Amino acid sequence: MRTEYCGQLNLSHVGQSVTLCGWVNRRRDLGGLIFIDMRDREGIVQVFFDPDHKAAFEQASELRNEFCIQITGTVRARPDSQINKDMSTGEVEIFANTLNIINRSEPLPLDSNQINSEEQRLKYRYLDLRRPEMADRLKSRAKITSFVRRFMDDHGFLDIETPMLTKATPEGARDYLVPSRVHKGKFYALPQSPQLFKQLLMMSGFDRYYQIVKCFRDEDLRADRQPEFTQIDVETSFMSADQVREVMEKLVRELWQETKGVDLGDFPVMTFAEAMRRYGSDKPDLRNPLELVDVASLVKDVEFKVFSGPANDAKGRVAALRVPGGAQLSRKQIDEYGQFVGIYGAKGLAWLKVNDRAAGLEGVQSPIAKFLSAEVLDAILVATQAESGDILFFGADSYKIVTDAMGALRLKVGRDLELTRLGTWAPLWVVDFPMFEDDSEGGLTAMHHPFTAPKDMSPEQLAAAPTTAIANAYDMVINGYEVGGGSVRIHRTEMQQTVFGILGITEDEQREKFGFLLDALKFGTPPHAGLAFGLDRLVMLLTGTDNIRDVIAFPKTTAAACLMTDAPSFANPASLQELSISVVAKKGTTDAGAEENQ
């Protein structure tokens, strides 16, 4: 039906007869001529209709926005005075001699001349995707996935699919369950990741595996998360953590070069402990120059108990954040920052303005200055490298509260004062994570997942001191986003059973949930390691949006609902009966859907 795409026409096509298919983006009547901007997935071109071609001209007078049409015409060069430099096709136009109105359009529920609500955009997603910026993002996504496949194929990785209907295993989030009609009362789980299957593929001898795969997690959502998401999943045998990172860094560097024309350079490597100490986050945004400085040793003897208390507590922390030029902040702004850190559990935010660095106590302004000696003040100013015109913010509380609150404050101040270098890229690797962290019930949980190997520990050493164990794990972080994470896996039965035991998984539970894995580990399992990238998040970064829904064709809301199809929906009672399922309303509620499905 077409010979060319609208957005691909240029001066090389002048004089040619072309047939185009697409939509009316805009119509204008000027000087007895009818002009339309015609749009398809590749872009927009100007088409005009002359009264001399009566049939086409009369039809063109009926055109309205979003009519689906086909035209045939001749490509002409625009006069110099009419060239539109804002359009890729701005040097040419089409003189149409035939027009076929394929389908008419009702007035759109979305207004192209104003900002539509996200709810409206998601409800009419098929119309929202017609917008050039949305189409461009999905085209970029297609090019990115194509590049990844070529890279992985060229580096000896095999694209192998793993099951979508599998067994529920504890991986941190809730599973989406699928009832079995054949096996009454039993359920499949949609995979949170292909983790165990890709490890089993290494045990099968496939050596290098990858897959661009859908994963599912029933968890609370935010702007950069979806209940179903796409991973670039990777696993290797006989490669060290350093070797895996080298190949994956090469992939990302070449991807950025291909799509953005940017050389990311070598990625710095930072330990988890250093990232938390300096930036208050295990995914630090290094575009922001601000850093936290521990000052507990300097204030442990001051009379100000807000400082000295946490400074003398093994589980406490006192940290300072120096903001260059921050002395200009008003008291109102400072108070707003105090309220902000309260979100993270901080009871307050101490501050100190350095008006004259050389004047000692006389040169600072702060409610806490009276509690500081000249020596302590000078030590703090030296440690933070404070200068005249700066402000220092202080956090003093438990280690977690201070780290979380001051890390978040660092990001907010960096944005508010335009200190963060927008338009640049700051990748890094974060390594040496703790193997375990405390859970809410006083036990331990795996910081990554229970199949991650510890660094340089035997099963006996790990069992004796699990809280000191360092995981052989690594995360790739770009501009404050964790874009990928991986680890060296456990490849010996004894170590895997030890980890399960530390996590409180009994031997019976181990056999029930992971018997197939424990059996497989007995048969010459090779050392293996891997990583998974969040494809949606990578595309989000590369296309310059801050909402992951912008790079997914048909995303869910933050309530895990599809406004377009009205999913999830109530099931047919007959289908539920066949599955031996009865839906019961929660006590104290009147759920019509539950009654309908009983």
Swiss-Prot record:
<dbReference type="GO" id="GO:0006422">
    <property type="term" value="P:aspartyl-tRNA aminoacylation"/>
</dbReference>
<keyword id="KW-0648">Protein biosynthesis</keyword>
<feature type="binding site">
    <location>
        <begin position="217"/>
        <end position="219"/>
    </location>
    <ligand>
        <name>ATP</name>
    </ligand>
</feature>
<protein>
    <recommendedName>
        <fullName>Aspartate--tRNA ligase</fullName>
        <ecNumber>6.1.1.12</ecNumber>
    </recommendedName>
</protein>
<keyword id="KW-0436">Ligase</keyword>
<dbReference type="InterPro" id="IPR004115">
    <property type="entry name" value="GAD-like_sf"/>
</dbReference>
<dbReference type="Pfam" id="PF00152">
    <property type="entry name" value="tRNA-synt_2"/>
</dbReference>
<dbReference type="Pfam" id="PF02938">
    <property type="entry name" value="GAD"/>
</dbReference>
<feature type="binding site">
    <location>
        <position position="171"/>
    </location>
    <ligand>
        <name>L-aspartate</name>
    </ligand>
</feature>
<feature type="binding site">
    <location>
        <position position="217"/>
    </location>
    <ligand>
        <name>L-aspartate</name>
    </ligand>
</feature>
<dbReference type="GO" id="GO:0005737">
    <property type="term" value="C:cytoplasm"/>
</dbReference>
<feature type="binding site">
    <location>
        <position position="226"/>
    </location>
    <ligand>
        <name>ATP</name>
    </ligand>
</feature>
<keyword id="KW-0547">Nucleotide-binding</keyword>
<feature type="binding site">
    <location>
        <position position="482"/>
    </location>
    <ligand>
        <name>ATP</name>
    </ligand>
</feature>
<feature type="binding site">
    <location>
        <position position="448"/>
    </location>
    <ligand>
        <name>L-aspartate</name>
    </ligand>
</feature>
<dbReference type="GO" id="GO:0005524">
    <property type="term" value="F:ATP binding"/>
</dbReference>
<dbReference type="GO" id="GO:0003676">
    <property type="term" value="F:nucleic acid binding"/>
</dbReference>
<feature type="binding site">
    <location>
        <begin position="534"/>
        <end position="537"/>
    </location>
    <ligand>
        <name>ATP</name>
    </ligand>
</feature>
<comment type="subunit">
    <text>Homodimer.</text>
</comment>
<dbReference type="InterPro" id="IPR045864">
    <property type="entry name" value="aa-tRNA-synth_II/BPL/LPL"/>
</dbReference>
<keyword id="KW-0030">Aminoacyl-tRNA synthetase</keyword>
<dbReference type="Pfam" id="PF01336">
    <property type="entry name" value="tRNA_anti-codon"/>
</dbReference>
<keyword id="KW-0963">Cytoplasm</keyword>
<comment type="function">
    <text>Catalyzes the attachment of L-aspartate to tRNA(Asp) in a two-step reaction: L-aspartate is first activated by ATP to form Asp-AMP and then transferred to the acceptor end of tRNA(Asp).</text>
</comment>
<keyword id="KW-0067">ATP-binding</keyword>
<feature type="region of interest" description="Aspartate">
    <location>
        <begin position="195"/>
        <end position="198"/>
    </location>
</feature>
<dbReference type="InterPro" id="IPR029351">
    <property type="entry name" value="GAD_dom"/>
</dbReference>
<dbReference type="InterPro" id="IPR004524">
    <property type="entry name" value="Asp-tRNA-ligase_1"/>
</dbReference>
<dbReference type="InterPro" id="IPR006195">
    <property type="entry name" value="aa-tRNA-synth_II"/>
</dbReference>
<feature type="binding site">
    <location>
        <position position="489"/>
    </location>
    <ligand>
        <name>L-aspartate</name>
    </ligand>
</feature>
<dbReference type="InterPro" id="IPR012340">
    <property type="entry name" value="NA-bd_OB-fold"/>
</dbReference>
<dbReference type="GO" id="GO:0004815">
    <property type="term" value="F:aspartate-tRNA ligase activity"/>
</dbReference>
<dbReference type="InterPro" id="IPR004365">
    <property type="entry name" value="NA-bd_OB_tRNA"/>
</dbReference>
<dbReference type="InterPro" id="IPR047089">
    <property type="entry name" value="Asp-tRNA-ligase_1_N"/>
</dbReference>
<comment type="similarity">
    <text>Belongs to the class-II aminoacyl-tRNA synthetase family. Type 1 subfamily.</text>
</comment>
<dbReference type="InterPro" id="IPR004364">
    <property type="entry name" value="Aa-tRNA-synt_II"/>
</dbReference>
<dbReference type="InterPro" id="IPR047090">
    <property type="entry name" value="AspRS_core"/>
</dbReference>
<dbReference type="InterPro" id="IPR002312">
    <property type="entry name" value="Asp/Asn-tRNA-synth_IIb"/>
</dbReference>
